[in-house]
């Protein structure tokens, strides 16, 4: 299922999640994002619920300098950090998606808006890099 919300950045990589994840991590690192959290939903659902599900991970990506500026501008904005990058395997490909930082941080006031725009520009470059790395995208 492809996401169509204007508040979501998305790209489909023609790779299984296990192969797409290092590509995504590399693209994030190139834009100064580190992965500070990781949730493997497939593993958690299997362990906790006995449910088999397709591969699905969320990577919590953070640019520490930018995050520090956001929190300094409005401490409550930490509620929207880090940027969650979702990797979801569908039909042998991996959908990579993220909520636009301007959408996630927009409710925290005008002092955060320019920082959200900077974060979004950086994250958009990550997704552009991922699109450039493949021959087909969605």
PLM feature segments, named:
Residues 15, 19, 40, 114, ...:
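Conserved active-site and cofactor/substrate-binding residues in soluble primary-metabolism enzymes
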Residues 84-109:
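Beta-strand/loop substructures that line and gate deep hydrophobic ligand-binding cavities in soluble
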Residues 104-138:
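Well-ordered alpha/beta subsegment
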Residues 5-7, 55, 81, 92:
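A generic structural signal for well-ordered coil/turn residues at beta-strand boundaries
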Residues 1-31, 128, 132, 136:
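Terminal, regulation- and interaction-focused segments at domain boundaries
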Residues 34-86:
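Compact, glycine-rich, soluble single-domain proteins
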Residues 79-92, 130-136:
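Short secondary-structure transition/capping segments
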């Amino acid at each position: 299922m492809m996401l169509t919300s204007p508040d979501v950045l998305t790209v489909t990589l023609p790779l299984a999640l296990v192969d797409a994840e290092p590509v995504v991590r590399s693209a994030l690192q190139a834009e100064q994002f580190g992965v500070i959290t990781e949730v493997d939903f497939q593993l958690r659902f299997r362990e906790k619920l006995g449910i088999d599900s397709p591969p699905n991970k969320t990577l919590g990506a953070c640019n520490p300098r930018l995050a520090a500026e956001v929190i300094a501008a409005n401490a409550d904005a930490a509620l929207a950090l880090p940027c969650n990058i979702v990797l979801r395997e569908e039909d042998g490909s991996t959908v990579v998606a993220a909520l636009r930082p301007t959408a996630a941080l927009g409710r925290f006031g005008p002092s955060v808006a320019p920082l959200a725009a900077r974060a979004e520009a950086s994250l958009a470059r990550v997704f552009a890099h991922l699109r450039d790395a493949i021959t087909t995208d969605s």
